[in-house]
Amino acid sequence: MELLDKLTILSDAAKYDAACTSSGVRRGFQPGKIGNTTSSIAGCCHSFSADGRCITLLKVLMTNCCVYDCKYCINRRSNDTRRAAFTPQELADLTIQFYRRNYIEGLFLSSGVLRNPDYTMEQMIHALRILRQDYGFNGYIHAKAIPGAAPELVQQLGLLADRLSVNIELPSQEGLQLLAPDKTKDAILRPMGQIRDQARQSKAELVKYKHAPVFAPAGQSTQLIVGATKDSDRHILHLTQSLYDRYKLKRVFYSAYVPVVEHSLLPSVDTKPPLLREHRLYQADWLLRFYGFRAEELLDEAHPDFNPLIDPKCSWAIAHLEQFPVEIMRADYEMLLRVPGIGPTGAKRIISARRTGTLRFEDLKKLGVVLKRAQFFITCGGRVRSGLQFSAASLVRQLEAVEQGQLPAAQMQQLSLFDPAG
């Protein structure tokens, strides 16, 4: 098979993997090396580096041949599809050629399971060794560890890649048994624990020895498929919280299930991917990582799924109206973070600006506050925004209008040239 045909097949087969990011990795310039994406920070496909640039990578599978028969996967053993596999040399050459043509600045490498997990990982490691050692490639590499592979192979992969990830795929053990019987929860979580421990050990050794080998400096991530099973948002979010707490993941990615195969246990191929649900989970994930929320605060047994029409932070605020409205001039940083429309940067600016005078609603816009959401939950100097209603039902209606791009009536005012000043 021609190399171009392999690339076409294996790049297309990799498109369902959402876990592409490079946050947290720093690769400085090294004399005699190639693949430096910036003078200080390397990046990943369609994510942003610290200087605001969008970084691209070559995103491919080592092979789409697979001994597993996961019912949701287009590359499953029983699916009738074109198969291909790169040799390690082919993949390394292809990556270098793409880099030298300025198409990419890094590599995202995953794979189906060819023969067994160990053999597949050996092929991936061989390809990355050629890139790093023979070609001196210093660009960003994100590699997928194969569940069930030997610990020593996971270690070797982590010494070659900037980021590792082990995909959980399905949020529950029941889902795995039903749709991916060849995979087990233990086989997925074991390498996660190893990556966590070895990354921690690597950081400790770097403090003592400047040239100690670096293990997965950009950490690890995972991916969850949303919509292939009946797991609730609450279950998914509690799993996410546990992964962040126990395994110190950098990111959990959510992938709306795209029906690509017909099966009685899966949504029909006519079902639209739950993209809005995926979006709400990402918003909730952001609240866990940067806003101090916990999963149990956002959803409960009575409300196991997010309202698709309102973002999770607004939903939480409406459910806790006893804490609102918040007085902008007195609220502490943690409380400001819980106000819809106010993020970490906005909260810090508010605390700084209010030291010099009383803030008005108009001032908040200049500080980066999203006033179309925040206005419902704050007072400025004891004043409430005119024309707003504060019952839960009215807030839901008004915020749904905001989400749909319609401003509340209180905001829609045409100024007149002949109005008296004041």
PLM features per residue range, with description:
Residues 92, 115-298:
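Conserved AdoMet/S-adenosylmethionine-binding subsite of the radical SAM
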Residues 265-337, 373-422:
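Long, highly charged, low-complexity intrinsically disordered interaction regions
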